[in-house]
């Protein structure tokens, strides 16, 4: 089987590559988004813009994998080829941007979903999924790191069956909810006059604390951003 893998996540790329020794007889080609400055082109890992590819390119692969790709897969691709997404959320809850951020805020379950893609965002029948515990001391970075580790664990466990076609497609349990980048951007600006409980403030800050990124901020008297984060430690 010839597999086309799209990822913009270095941790997932490196971890997935370590699994490949188990899959002799299959060919894996790796691509990332051209605007991703974190990567350098190499023989094994090349920039490629999906929407500019021809039908001949799509037809040359048996399976397309999206592993934290920043590109939307074209309708022509997902409607005519097997495309599978590894999504860092528990579909149908918090589809879209940064599922773990919104799980901290709205209390919906978080986890990992491997699903067949369709033309909607983070949508389609489910192959495998696992829920992860969201702890009171978790920041976005804490739970996200566990999600990434779980993704690699699930890929190792289920990739043989995926390549062999040994899986069952289960419809999503409803449409759930979806969050967009604009929703996240609105969360980042803190209004110091907004009324909230201590619990709501703590949850907002831990949802937006994700080193090395500076997300939460308020504006000072000069209109300059002052960035805010939170450190949490559970007693032993």
Question: What is each of the regions a protein language model found here?
Answer:
Residues 1-236:
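One-carbon transfer enzymes
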């Amino acid at each position: 089987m010839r597999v086309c893998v799209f990822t913009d996540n270095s941790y997932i790329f490196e971890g997935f590559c370590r699994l490949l020794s188990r899959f002799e007889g299959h060919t894996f080609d790796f691509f990332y988004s051209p605007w991703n400055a974190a990567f350098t082109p190499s023989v094994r890992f090349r920039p490629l813009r999906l929407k500019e590819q021809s039908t001949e390119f799509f037809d040359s692969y048996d399976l397309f994998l999206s592993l934290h790709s920043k590109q939307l897969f074209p309708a022509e691709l997902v409607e005519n080829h097997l495309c599978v997404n590894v999504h860092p959320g528990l579909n149908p809850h918090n589809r879209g941007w940064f599922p773990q951020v919104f799980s901290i805020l709205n209390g919906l379950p978080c986890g990992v979903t491997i699903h067949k893609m369709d033309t909607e965002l983070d949508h389609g029948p489910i192959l495998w999924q696992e829920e992860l515990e969201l702890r009171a001391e978790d920041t976005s970075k804490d739970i996200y790191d566990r999600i990434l580790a779980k993704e690699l664990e699930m890929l190792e466990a289920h990739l043989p069956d995926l390549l062999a076609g040994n899986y069952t497609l289960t419809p999503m349990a409803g449409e759930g909810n979806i969050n967009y980048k604009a929703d996240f951007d609105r969360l980042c600006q803190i209004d110091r006059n907004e009324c909230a409980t201590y619990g709501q403030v703590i949850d907002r800050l831990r949802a937006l604390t994700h080193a090395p990124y500076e997300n939460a901020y308020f504006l000072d008297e000069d209109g300059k951003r002052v960035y805010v984060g939170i450190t949490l430690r559970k007693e032993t």
